[in-house]
Amino acid sequence: MKNRKRDTRWLVGVAMFVALQLVLQITGIGLIPLPLIKATTLHIPVILGAVVLGPLAGAILGGVFGICSIWTNTVAPSGLSFAFSPVLAAETAGAAGAVKAVWIAFGCRVMIGVVAGWLWIVLKKVKVNDLIALPVVGVAGAMTNTVLVMGSIYVLLRPEYAALKNVAMEAVLGLVMGVVGTSGVAEAIAAAILVTAVGKALLHVPAFRAKPQMG
């Protein structure tokens, strides 16, 4: 009976975070269009869900983030949308391009929740204070997103990225590092602040005090 009650709370918690992600997506503040990439706030619910519900929930929420990314980049494309939309990628690079886009848009986002969830478990096992652990997990989750996405673009789509930016292939690494050092750092700082503020409050909610689901 206890396990059933805990599982029900877990499912309700996951549904709550999914609903928050959908609100961010529908209102347009989940993925904010910039000239060549879309800045994101959708990683925040993924990280928070991973903290209070565990890595499995984090992976599910990361998958929802990925689906939102694919949808947005397909129906409202910007310069780099071919890297996040298997539909657009398939038009220019066939099935191989579609697979690459699925990994970048979906797979990398699943990893946000996995990394954040397991890092939180490790930090709590070694008894790190919440006020330290929460911002660390926030930064790690945000940087997992930025580094995996931009790193995958560099490894898998370097020629296409060079063509988009109208630069030589040798210049792509510098451009990728520029994105990581600007929008990536900004997203990490925002994640540290928001995950700490909201996460601290959520950890006082009785429903989130139970042992999180690990897989």
Regions found by a protein language model. Give the residues of each.
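Loop-helix junctions at membrane interfaces
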Residues: M1-G215
